């Protein structure tokens, strides 16, 4: 009985690890900021993911995410610096 419990826990843990890794691989896509330009969300063709960070400059209104939702490049509005920042 102990072996069954152990393997059940191991199986559930492996499913959790697989889901986390799968999510990180599909999070590339565009992001949009809120009205204040602070919180960003990555848009994938199937779902929307939050970048969980504040943009370095509040002027960022659009951009794109690379790798997963914690790495975002910010574009700036017309008249602002054209450089991209990562946070």
UniProtKB/Swiss-Prot annotation:
SUPFAM superfamilies to which the protein is assigned, alphabetical: Scorpion toxin-like (SSF57095)
Keywords noted in UniProt: Disulfide bond, Ion channel impairing toxin, Neurotoxin, Secreted, Signal, Toxin, Voltage-gated sodium channel impairing toxin
GO molecular function per UniProt: sodium channel inhibitor activity; toxin activity
Disulfides per UniProt: 42-65, 51-72, 55-74
UniProt keyword Disulfide bond, yes or no: yes
Gene Ontology CC terms, in alphabetical order: extracellular region
Source superkingdom: Eukaryota
Main location: secreted
Tissues in which the UniProt entry reports expression: Expressed by the venom gland.
Signal sequence, start to end: 1-22
Pfam entry (one): Toxin_3
Subcellular location: Secreted
Family stated for the protein in its record: Belongs to the long (3 C-C) scorpion toxin superfamily. Sodium channel inhibitor family.
Its biological purpose: Putative sodium channel toxin.
Name used for this protein in its record: Putative sodium channel toxin Ts38
Organism: Tityus serrulatus
Organism classification: Eukaryota, Metazoa, Ecdysozoa, Arthropoda, Chelicerata
């Amino acid at each position: 009985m102990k072996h069954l419990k152990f393997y059940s826990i191991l199986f559930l843990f492996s499913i959790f690890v697989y889901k986390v890794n799968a999510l990180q691989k599909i999070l590339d896509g565009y992001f949009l900021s809120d009205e204040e330009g602070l919180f960003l969300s990555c848009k994938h063709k199937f779902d929307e993911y939050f970048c969980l960070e504040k943009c370095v400059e509040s002027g960022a209104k659009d951009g794109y995410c690379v790798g997963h939702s914690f790495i975002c490049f910010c574009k700036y509005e017309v008249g602002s610096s054209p450089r991209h920042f990562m946070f």
